[in-house]
Amino acid sequence: MDRDEIVSFLDEFLNISAYPDKSKNGLQVEGKEEVNTIAFAVDASLDTILKAKVFNADMLIVHHGIIWGGISYVRGLIAKRLKELLVAGINLYAVHLPLDAHPEVGNNVQLLKLLNLEAKEPFGEYHGVKIGYIGEFDEPKPLPLIAQILAEKLPAEYVKSYEFGLQEVKRIAVVSGGGGFAIEEASRKADLLITGEITHEDYRVAEDLRVSVIAAGHYATETLGVKALMGVLKEKFGVKTVFIDNPTGL
């Protein structure tokens, strides 16, 4: 399959031009023109790149790429990562905020699906765009039950509940990854915020605003989008796909 055809589809399908993002979304590193195997991962770490080589991947699609705001020098770690990609001819495609926000395969829509919820409205303003969503149960549910469901569908060791608000919740706000910035907005619009991880200061903000938070793992909540995107590309282009699981424990 032609690389440029895949890239063109991804750029349009993910609407990457609509999101101001520190990440340089799109094809970050150009490799082989012919793509037969695509690897998917959360992070373009050196270890992930080396694993992509083992799978003979022609393209690596990630949520977190290697270019954030630009490259000042090609030395050290960035040089090592680029060298492995270029020597192997692996195309690197990164999609950050557009994959969080995508209405079909996005991390946050997929996170709601774990609870059998649909996205009712955009949520979580970040750099001028909404990257999360709010879903709503027909009837309020016990907060511990929601945490239990997430622990059954994501690695249980990542799921942590911070119960500062209602014990019965109906409106659920989701922002995958580091969603602590959305706590204040959640206090006004939802009964519960589900995110990946929160900081020490985020904890105090949630405590003071009396809004409950479930942190289900930064890494774990951001595997959802790349896995969903993997299915789309496999069906559309008939390429071989592989997900490289390289958890951080965070």
Swiss-Prot record:
The cross-references to SUPFAM superfamilies, in alphabetical order and at most eight, read: NIF3 (NGG1p interacting factor 3)-like (SSF102705)
Gene3D superfamilies, per the entry: NIF3 (NGG1p interacting factor 3)-like
A single Gene Ontology CC term = cytoplasm
List residues binding a divalent metal cation 2: H64, H218, E222
Q: Where does a divalent metal cation 1 bind?
A: H63, D100, E222
Q: Which UniProt keywords apply?
A: Metal-binding
GO MF term (any one): metal ion binding
For whether the record's keyword set contains Metal-binding, the answer is yes
Record InterPro entries? DUF34/NIF3 (IPR002678), DUF34/NIF3_sf (IPR036069)
Family as reported in the entry's similarity comment: Belongs to the GTP cyclohydrolase I type 2/NIF3 family.
- Spell out the subunit comment: Homohexamer.
Question: Would you tell me the protein name for this molecule?
Answer: GTP cyclohydrolase 1 type 2 homolog
Species name: Pyrococcus horikoshii (strain ATCC 700860 / DSM 12428 / JCM 9974 / NBRC 100139 / OT-3)
The taxonomy runs: Archaea, Methanobacteriati, Methanobacteriota, Thermococci, Thermococcales
